[in-house]
Amino acid sequence: MSNEKARENAAEEKAERSLLGASSITGSMTLVSRFLGLARDVVIARLFGASDAADAFFLANKIPNFLRRLFAEGAFNQAFVPVLSEYRSLRSHDDVRELIAAVAASLGGIITLISVVVMIAAPVIAIPLAYGFNDEPGKFALFVEMLRITFPYLLLISMTALCGAVLNSYGRFAVPAITPALLNICLIGSAFLLAPYLHTPELALAWGVLIAGVAQLLFQLPFLAQMRLLPMPKPSAGHEGVARIKTLMLPALFGVSVNQINLLLDSFIASLLVSGSVSWLYFSDRLMELPLGTFGVALAIVVLPSLSRKHAENSLAEFTQTLDWALRLVFLIAVPAALALVMLAKPLLITLFHNDNFSVNDVQQAAGSLQAYALGLLGFMAVKVFAPGFYARQDTRTPVRIAMIALAVNMLLNVVFYLQGFAHVGLAAATSIAACVNAGLLLRGLLQQGAFRFARGWGVWLLRLAAANSALAAFLYTQAGMWRDWLEWSASAQIMHMAILVGGGLAVYAIVLVAAGLRWRDVYR
């Protein structure tokens, strides 16, 4: 065995010894990015509010981001990481480089073609995507312009996702996890520095997205160069690894991204509602993404390679133990996070977004959809854990069937809630219910296939969580006060009170958990 291969294996074994450590690194870097994202949303809300132009940007930006999560991150990662791991273990470093080059050429070629078509045909494509804007020519034209500006981001971020997948596979989790922070920095900078010079200030956000795509890709390349794995696109017709990745990707494209399809449907129907609906959904979704994007995604990133190795080693006991550990962490994090988002929805929105451009009505409307999204947080995070349980075993068909059921549930509920007049809150509720259905069916599938079983101690675990969350709810209820009182406070008073609620809530939650018997060994793996 070469020294290089020995170093790689040693790093992999070290990462394997502590899934919690790897998750913590990924989660902490992601948390930095999420806080910058929160700062970005505060800037956008305070500078642009919930205007027609803001609606146009959020919807235009959602299209390439949806495709990014569909192609570049979701299904691609599920297909690429297992094949790359196999090449690392069984083949030479040159073979790994050839695989990366071939994948870069194939993925880049497909995304480039899609981007060119969309940019040319944007006015036609925009008709169904922003159907609710068709009666407002100015808003529709702005959406088309923003779509053309933001769509090349898909190609840039797809290459960034490829680089990130390679880095994650080699145990270098921090760099890909911090990369999204550059998007937030670019958007904040564009809002302050570029917006004053444009005829429509919100266009600065679209240009900020494109600038961020370039920055994110350039940021990761030096780290790959150090590993001698810089992706130099090189077409390789019939490359065995690329063919296998495509085979795995096709069914995974739908299954792994059902939540994104649900959110896209929400935005489409929201465009039919009153002005501001798209923005209300956006801001509430962003706050819900704080716990989901920080902890849920971190778990998914770390768990997939671990489960893939367990399956390759035919170690069913360790496979199911890893899933059980991840599910316990989901409950540990998702339940209190959802509880806090529901109880503090309006104070949180007031503290972060309320000003002349984001009115009291905007706060009330966004709070409704935030609470609806929060109720599905456990389901959203559970999907992040359960889906890798199938993909690690190269079973892509079961998640697809389940995703189709969940999507049908979401579409049906969207229509029902829309007709019942629940507006944007109904759309958020439908997405949450569909996520819970998705998670429940994935769990049932894992149990039926014998790939997962609940370990001993779940009853005690749930009792501890019930006690801790009850204490947390009591603390928030007694200390938060009436939400309208927050409107009278200064910004510094709002921030201080929110910090006390968050810090005090975390302390109460942790103290009760420890008092109930939770120990480090219960969460460390």
What is the role of each PLM region?
Residues 2-525:
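Membrane-embedded alpha-helical bundles of multi-pass transporters/translocases
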